[in-house]
Regions:
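Fe(II)/2-oxoglutarate oxygenase catalytic core
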Residues: 1-219, 223-253
Length: 253
């Protein structure tokens, strides 16, 4: 598949990227991938939702969002695109994010299939805003190697992003904005991964630790509101890398 990825991907935008220990890198790429078979409807497993108790704030998991084969494809795609230190268009304080990342726009068909699988389990309304029938096409994928971690933080809220109709530019959507983080684990402990749990806090107290599992997705509130969830990515203690993708769940403005 490597040759297919290389021929069906391109740099669609370049932004200033923040480095893990401080400083910036100009021209950090965001890629566009035209790979129609990234997710296939016939591969869809039967997902299951499990709520997480973190003191009344919204947090839940959906199991088996992707198959192992689909997760392996996503890992191969992102490795071919190339992980790097700089995160384009994202500002984090020095020392908060210690991992490598690649940001890309997934095909609209793949994101529509992903939304179809999770939509029945998502809140249909939050703070009076209705669930948008589309996920942001921008996927922020992270690779954690031994010793990497993401220290305590609250995720920011974002507009949605996709391609212009002619596919030549990245465009920012209007009329919709993110309210939920989706963390999609592409591998897990069953692959030999050690450490790297996502820990969730409420009022400074650890309330839950979510172990990475292939195909599992974790959801929680983000942005500048009292229901946003403080969380961290624990230190990876083994030699098997951890792969996780952040995807934004959108709600109408």
């Amino acid at each position: 598949m490597s040759d297919i990825i290389l021929h069906r991907s391109r740099v669609i935008a370049r932004l200033t990227g923040t480095l893990p220990e401080g400083g910036y890198e100009e021209g950090t790429p965001i890629h566009a991938v035209d790979f129609p078979d990234l997710l296939r409807a016939q591969d869809a497993p039967p997902p299951q939702r499990h709520d997480i108790d973190i003191g009344g704030k919204l947090a839940f998991m959906i199991e088996d969002v992707l198959t192992r084969a689909e997760c392996a494809r996503l890992i191969e795609v992102t490795e071919q695109l190339g992980f790097r230190d700089a995160a384009p268009g994202i500002n984090t304080p020095p020392g908060m994010r210690r991992n490598k990342t690649v940001h890309w726009l997934a095909p609209a068909a793949a994101m529509a299939e992903l939304f179809r699988r999770i939509a029945p389990f998502l809140p249909q309304e939050l703070d009076g805003r209705r669930l948008s029938p589309i996920l942001s096409h921008r996927i922020n994928t992270y690779r954690y190697d031994r010793g990497d971690e993401f220290n305590l933080h609250i995720d920011g809220d974002w507009p949605g992003f996709g391609l212009t109709p002619d596919g030549t530019r990245m465009t920012q959507w209007s009329g919709t904005h993110s309210m939920l983080t989706m963390l999609l684990y592409l591998n897990g402990a069953e692959d030999g991964l050690q450490g790297g749990a996502t820990t969730l806090y409420d009022k400074g107290e650890l309330r839950a630790a979510v172990t990475p599992r292939t195909g599992r997705a974790l959801f929680f509130r983000h942005g500048s509101n009292r229901d946003s969830v403080l969380h961290a990515g624990d230190t990876l203690t083994g030699d098997v890398p951890k792969y996780v993708a952040r995807i934004n769940v959108m709600y109408d403005v």
